[in-house]
Amino acid sequence: MSVPDYMQCAEDHQTLLVVVQPVGIVSEENFFRIYKRISSVSQISVRDSQRALYIRYRHHYPPENSEWGDFQTHRKVVGLITITDCFSAKDWPQIFEKFHVQKEIYGSTLYDSRLFVFGLQGEIAEQPRTDVAFYPSYEDCATVEKRIEDFVESLFIVLESKRLDRATDKSGDKIPLLCVPFEKKDFVGLDTDSRHYKKRCQGRMRKHVGDLCLQAGMLQDSLVHYHMSVELLRSVNDFLWLGAALEGLCSASVIYHYPGGTGGKAGARRFPGSALPAEAANRHRPGALTTNGINADTSTEIGRAKNCLSPEDIIEKYKEAISYYSKYKNAGVIELEACVKAVRVLAIQKRSMEASEFLQNAVYINLRQLSEEEKIQRYSILSELYELIGFHRKSAFFKRVAAMQCVAPSISEPGWRACYKLLLETLPGYSLSLDPQDFNKGTHRGWAAVQMRLLHELVYASRRMGNPALSVRHLSFLLQTMLDFLSDQEKKDVTQSLENYTSKCPGTMELLTLPDGLTLPPVPFTKLPIVRRVKLLDLPASLRPQKMKSSLGPSVSAKSPFIYSPIIAHSRGEERSKKIDFQWVQGDVCEVQLMVYNPMPFELRVENMGLLTSGVEFESLPAALSLPAESGLYPVTLVGVPQTTGTITVSGYHTTVFGVFSDCLLDSLPGIKTSGSTVEVIPALPRLQISTSLPRSAHSLQPSSGDKISTNVSVQLYNGETQQLVVRLENIGMEPLEKLEVTSKILTTKEKLYGDFLSWKLEDTLAQFPLQPGKVATFTISIKVKLDFSCQENLLQDLSDDGISVSGFPLCSPFRQVVRPRVESKPVNAAEGGRPGEPCHVKTLEAVLNFKYSGGPGHVEGYYRNLALGLHVEVEPSVFFTRVSTLPATSTRQCHLLLDVFNATEHELSVGARSDEELILHAGECQRMAIQVDKFNFESFPESPADKGQFANSKHLEEERQEARGLEINSKLDIHWTIPSLKRTGEASVEGLLNQLVLEHLQLAPLLWDVLVDGQPCDCQAAACRVGDPVRLEVRLTNRSPRSVGPFALSVVPFQDHQNGVHSYDLRHAVSFVGSGTFYLDKVQPSGQAACLGALLFLYTGDFFLHIRFHEDGPSKELPPSWFCLPSVHVRALEAQA
């Protein structure tokens, strides 16, 4: 026997072997359809008996193996079933002849045979025959199973007769010597009458009868015969048959202990009798003795238990039997099959280590020269048995050996598909799976070097199969999962091979389905490059949408009727943590930053890298990048445009590396850091681009509010100068610009500003709205810088050192602090024209212009954008007022304001006020200018804290009053300067310069006195009269104070001024009063008026002056002297007309 049956198991010893073969030409499909139905009848109960008969079917069985039927009866072909097609009666004789030829092949061992004929109808088919069954077709053959049962019963009859014949004790008869084929020549010439020979014959026959009893369902009798045979054969050292007897004993014991079988076949063997399930469950318990259907006598069960081996003894007897087989070179197949049977029993007993010893012995059993197909079968069975005992890696090893055997060089047509299929089956044994997700779970499992070798073999096998897509998938899997174990050279080799493959068949993310139904998942390159962090970026500051504030406040939601709900606030914490608190805008380019790392020892080119999103229609704009070798963390920004609104989730990214397209999901990336992957997309908004007439600034403003400045512009102005800033607004978006608001915020707080620094008018610009995409609108912003024009202390010191002497009141007051030099002041450099060591007087003003605009669908939803323009203004000093004072004018309603003006520029400068002549000042020159001004009525400003409650204290009130007065005075003065060489002009302000004393001199008294001579007001001009004519004199009082005043008594004193400092008051001979020289005024209410009248008579010609003075009585003493400022009266007496 040269062909081992690797599917053998211990329970096969009780089966009858039936061969099913086709006769003539029968299609494979039809043959196996009937074969499947025939093989379903594998166990039947014998009539009138409680025994069961088991059948083992084979469609191919070497005839020479039947020659070992005396050695082990289950190897003998006892039944033959042939299947044939016959559609004509003419073919019937030839087919029947072939049937007889087929029977002759197994004729020496056959008990019975059958021929199943399909397709023949007519007279021949209607003849009743026991050995032939006719059926019209393969579909119309309902009695096949019944015919097989009858056939098996006929086999049982022959088997039973043989058993009875061999088991009957025939005293005196000579027992024949049963031999195996290779023994026949060894027994020629032996003494057949010797006692040793007779024992040998008896022992072998006892063993043979035990086999027949086991096949006939008589388990007890078989155990008895096996024991007797063992004793007889051991005594004569017949080791080969002793091993067979021991194996038979083991098989019978296995059948008793393990009624479910050891071969792992579907379904357990069924035993007749209703008590079978209970006894099968209890059979493994010591002392649980039940019948197995032979008879109901418990004594038989006791006897069987005594003769039956224990589970431990079964293995010992198997070892002994195999040791006897090993003594015979020609018994290698028997030894190999015994090892396989023992392994299956040990697998049931979960004794893996002992089973591995039997398998190791089976590996080294030397058989004849096996064919390549037999080698493949042998290694495959060894693999299955190692898998059965839990030795997965050993199983995978032999499976891989079988795979390599399929493509051995000696095979003319290598079976690459079979090789590939076997290699796939080895993967679990080497802790490999074809799902790359399994390699993201914890540490690497398995032997990486072996795994890489196996994956390389899969790549090669799939290529030889002619499936390049499969090669690309396996090579991609190798690169992705084994990257950490590849050397630098191996990385280069693998990637080069991958590029060669993908040049013909690009790698995709589709599932690959193999012919056997196995699917290979896609392999995304999550390590090429490695992504460590993903961050969704906010839009640029100028494009970030902002929500218009509701009048109800931000805590009120339109979706909930409740002001506060803890359910809303605390639910879905995980989902909230992934959602980002800024928004993207429909139609705008949005960015996601990835920190990537190239683990390869060479430059990595990544093509077509873009974002994977869900929830919103998103147009990803692919990028291509090249990462240097082992680059470290490298920032990469991926962009895209959301096309619709809603909530968008960035789920990953896609790449094309080495020709393999990958979809990499963030959830499958190990160790990745992300601040969130979900963001809200709001409706589209317009995009505003701003350009100005000023140059961009190198200074970057940093507002304390944290606002981002998109554009910075700068300008250099002289103090008091005004610059026009033209702002160009262009709608570069796709939505109309419908709303625009402009606000400003001054960032500089150290410098005191006077007047409006920035001013504009939007009416004409807004008239052009809505501003359609691509359209432009402009408007003008006026930049007016008016800082303090007073001189700083350090500059005053410089002037004093230069010998410049100025008089008047110092420029400091209780209500104004002198500005100290700033810490950031630095020497003026050569570009600014200052002398070395001269302090810098350039000041800086910074402001932010905010353009709040909206339009389109986003405006409907209440969103807007804010664009910030930073303005940096460097203010150089133009002129300084170093001293200020006043002089009275000829009119009581006017005075002279004296200003010492210093030219702080490096250019010639002219200063003027109103329409007066301009004063020319050279660089660094100081001159005094006098300006005649009308006195001011300041009574419209609050007098006390009680009059204006918003001022916290009297000091603050007084400061406000000072500023208001300074503003009014400055508006009337209209002081301006011009630098002709630069063609630059500006204004100079006295705001903040005037101290309290100067203000008092510039203020109109609360009591307004008017003197009229002959009805004409007399203030600074002489009133003419005739000598001898009475002159009417009227004094009027207007009370502008908030209180009532009076009564007053006034005296008129005439005098003459000789223009040499001498005044003559003794004018009784020259001036005469008509009536009394004293005038009386009654009490005058607030805003009221009063007047008193008198007359004078001038007797001589000349210039006379009238001095009106008050009597120092009670009412006049309560008021300050400045309230009684009456104009000087000049009367010129002329010759009387003739």
From Swiss-Prot:
Origin: domain of life: Eukaryota
Cellular compartments annotated: Golgi apparatus, cis-Golgi network; Endoplasmic reticulum; Cytoplasm
GO cellular component, one term: trans-Golgi network
Pfam families associated with the record: TRAPPC9-Trs120 (PF08626)
InterPro entries: TRAPP_II_complex_Trs120
Residues that bear Phosphoserine: 557, 944
Record keyword Phosphoprotein present: yes
Keywords, sorted A to Z: Cytoplasm, Differentiation, Endoplasmic reticulum, Golgi apparatus, Phosphoprotein
One biological process term in Gene Ontology: cell differentiation
The family this protein is said to belong to: Belongs to the NIBP family.
Assembly behavior: Component of the multisubunit TRAPP (transport protein particle) complex, which includes at least TRAPPC2, TRAPPC2L, TRAPPC3, TRAPPC3L, TRAPPC4, TRAPPC5, TRAPPC8, TRAPPC9, TRAPPC10, TRAPPC11 and TRAPPC12. Directly interacts with IKBKB and MAP3K14.
Role according to the record: Functions as an activator of NF-kappa-B through increased phosphorylation of the IKK complex. May function in neuronal cells differentiation. May play a role in vesicular transport from endoplasmic reticulum to Golgi.
Listed name of the protein: Trafficking protein particle complex subunit 9
Lineage: Eukaryota, Metazoa, Chordata, Craniata, Vertebrata
